[in-house]
Amino acid sequence: MIRNLPALLMLLMLSAVLMFATANGAWLARVPPSDHQKTNPYGGQPQAVAAGRNIFEEHCAKCHGENAEGVKKRPSLRTERIQQQATEGDLHWLLVNGSMKKGMPSWAKLPDPQLWQLVTYLKSLHE
Amino acid sequence: MKTSAISVLLILAAALPAAAQERPYFVTYSHEMEEPGNLDIEVFNAVGKPPGANRFLGSNIEFEYGVKTWWTSEFYLDGQATANDSTIFTGYRWENRFRPLLREHWINPVIYVEFENTSADKALREVVGHDGVPDFLVPNWLARQDKEREIETKLILGSNYRGWNISENIIAEKNLSNDPWEFGYAWAVSRPLKLAASARKCAFCAERFQAGLEMYGGLGDRYSFGLNQTSHYVGPTVNWSAPNGPTISFSPQFGLNDYSIPRLYRFGVSYEIEQFLGIFRGGN
């Protein structure tokens, strides 16, 4: 039993790491290449940032915080993953499909231009 | 008791409402689920004057709660008022919707299961079987004696494409007494008047209005499937979502045959409370 203890601990640690990876950002690996490469038709436009801010306040702020800083278990949208690792196409894909097992609903009910405006706002947060 | 009721009302009034982005449909369900933790309170009404019967107002109040991203549960209380007759509570319904596919596809199915216990219902939230004008000729005292304990199932199919929402419902309903399965359908399309949001905050921007068309009707029952002696309705529909406030919907609908009520006027108000249970936990 004692001989197997290190292997058991390694297995537990590996499981914990895998669970953490799944719970945090595993969605990025699921984004199809065609969506990953999509370009934002509103990229960097100040008007789109303002419109995206309005959409964020109406639909997202209650869960993700007024300034996207995260609320309790709902993640911050100012993290490196959102601001650096994820492309605008990745964020658009996440908004369309959600991450339903993790509690993030699909926002496909918003028209596509509004989703891109929201992405523009989210990407403006790192500046 | 009175103090606690007032406290609950105050908490609800202070709760942060959300722009619900509801579809302007009265009968048709879209595949879009309630966001988890949100409570949507909706009041829907239908006014009509069947030939040879009194004018009526059928109403229901609905409490729709997002249990999970893939599971929405809803409780209804129904009532109706008929001119020269009476105003009565007609029963309750409890429905659950489940979304089996957890990503957005071209066509998105949702499974709907409802139990209803109603009598003399005139809210017309669905039309199935041979529902039609003859049901409205019966006075309330007599209609109330016909208790309808029913299981209703729907296959909801929904698509979003270039701002358009297209939704189709296939309905099968079974009275738990010895009645046969009854069938019906509903479909609707709608689109916001403008797809992109405005940079400034505004109450009456075009993107806050949605317009569309809705059609629904009965398809007979297991022993007499088809269009014979079934009612059908079609009409334009529109809604407006106030910023951080209610959504108001309206639709004039027209009966397509003699078995249908010639005109129905539907109107509704819905109000969404975000993260409803969080209010009682003293946080977000």
Regions found by a protein language model. Name each.
Chain B
Residues A20-N284:
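Transmembrane beta-barrel domains of Gram-negative outer membranes and organellar outer membranes
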